[in-house]
Amino acid sequence: NSIGSLYFTKEAYDKLYPGYGSSYVNFYGGIGLLFEQASSRGHMQETTTLPITFAFTIRNQFAASLATVRASAGEKEMLRKLRKDFFSSAMAQAKASPIKAYVFGDSKDVSRTNAFINLLLLHQIEVYESNQVITSNGKTFEKGKYFIVPTELSNYIMVRSAFE
């Protein structure tokens, strides 16, 4: 290109895993992009194609960031529609799913349950405390010792990913 960068455009990672920062936004109606930059390993590293300097790596990241911002601004209406369609599709999938809620809890390890609840809340997933005893698949859940996450939520894709 105009600044002398080489490109690799093949997808070589699992972008469906929400633990990657570049793919997390995919679970909330965004478009996850991954810009990988070879390391200069300090000030400079010799490679088989060209020497990579720290300044060169910074310039590449900056150029990629500006190009992304420009492209996003130029396509803002399409991106808004994509996000709206994503959440509409998520709600339709949730309504069509036979799973209407996820029930969880560990009465023997309350700390573990609380840690999971905090993780769900961090990701803006609604969690409700039980108010009655239920039995499901031969397991009895006591009042106040289990929690419920409904699936009919706009962030259904993330909810499903967290539980499946």
Regions found by a protein language model. Give the residues of each.
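Intrinsic-disorder/low-complexity accessory segments
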Residues: 1-6, 11-17, 21-164
